[in-house]
Amino acid sequence: MSPEATTRSGVVFRVLDAMDAPHSGRILRLRLQSGEAPSIKSLKGSTLKAVSPDGDECRGKVLGFAAFGGKPSNERLARTGRIDVHVEELDDTGPVGLRWEVHPS
């Protein structure tokens, strides 16, 4: 199965922490909630759909990864289920916050 297909097949992350990035965008600390961990390569540059507990939706683009939790790798994501992503919000419905569900698309 290709990394792109894996990313779209029921993968759901939960936002554990969200903060403004130093220059632009947001840093989201994500935990894999369900599905198989996607590859780092498939996440970079992908579009994410975030859904709040109230049902509000926000889209964002993954610009890169925050390294303060350690260098991101496929093995680390598969083992821990956690990743820190730097996202640019693509619409004005955000900001994405705690307990939001994030779906890669």
Task: Give, region by region, the residue ranges found by the protein language model.
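C-terminal effector/interaction modules appended to NTPase cores
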Residues: 2-105
